[in-house]
């Protein structure tokens, strides 16, 4: 049993300590693949109720912790959760995803947005994180998370999930000043929100810029990277020792640029070999990832082989084992259990297969 004075395994990895195995957790480890989650969803069909009611969100956050004992427990929430606190309302429709109506398309709408006051608008976040810290103790690190400005802007401007990002790219290339104003406001709000999560108990922050991989490297440097960097800089001013993870879906073409944001860890998807990713990122950055979530549909022997291969390639320092994206909803729960069990036993498995 870990004591409050002990340092969680995941935090030790972010400090570059030499460990006998990498810490392990999964993006979307609390979710639809778990029967316990589906049962709770039947009782509480509204996503916003599940994520904004303290008791329900804590229960969901802890479901995978009780079942699999990952080294990280992430807040059950959504990257859009802080948007109403600045004046952008949203809903999440089952099978359709987020809906923002009306979408943000004019300068007048941007000018109406107001600074975020998390304690007034988002007190449930503090309550959830404080409760998770008490429940988890230091048996695992508690992670908070935020959406990056580009991805939040994409949802707000498109009004929904989409494939081609027509409206935000139209704004970027036809009215860049207006988009920069919006991105700046989002960055300020997100930095305040991240600090609030840390002050409430989050020991690590992961920033998701899910749609930045849709940008060319040139446009990433113009519309995404500066605002990621602004968020990190603002948070590091007050919380310099809190590890910061950056995840971009489809980041293979952007890897060398991601450390420029000032983050401590880059979360890599499966579109790049993790040994190559480490080489491209340099020695001063920890890496997280990067197993294809589809691997969890394979046989347990196949899953084990991919875990071993990934850990060997990533090296024995500064690596957090994770998927390259979130757990897919059809994933067999027993395979997730096997993944965690194997990851925890990896030091003996590596010795046997050396």
Swiss-Prot record:
Example GO biological process: protoporphyrinogen IX biosynthetic process
Sites annotated Transition state stabilizer: 78
Any one Gene Ontology cellular component term annotated for this protein: cytoplasm
Record GO terms (molecular function): uroporphyrinogen decarboxylase activity
Catalyzed chemical reaction(s): uroporphyrinogen III + 4 H(+) = coproporphyrinogen III + 4 CO2
Keyword Cytoplasm: yes
Pfam families hit by this protein: URO-D
Gene3D superfamilies cross-referenced by the UniProt entry: 3.20.20.210
Top EC category: lyase
UniProt: substrate binding residues: 28-32, 78, 155, 210, 325
Xref: PANTHER family: METHYLTETRAHYDROFOLATE:HOMOCYSTEINE METHYLTRANSFERASE RELATED (PTHR21091), UROPORPHYRINOGEN DECARBOXYLASE (PTHR21091:SF169)
Function, in words: Catalyzes the decarboxylation of four acetate groups of uroporphyrinogen-III to yield coproporphyrinogen-III.
Protein name (record): Uroporphyrinogen decarboxylase
UniProt organism field: Trichodesmium erythraeum (strain IMS101)
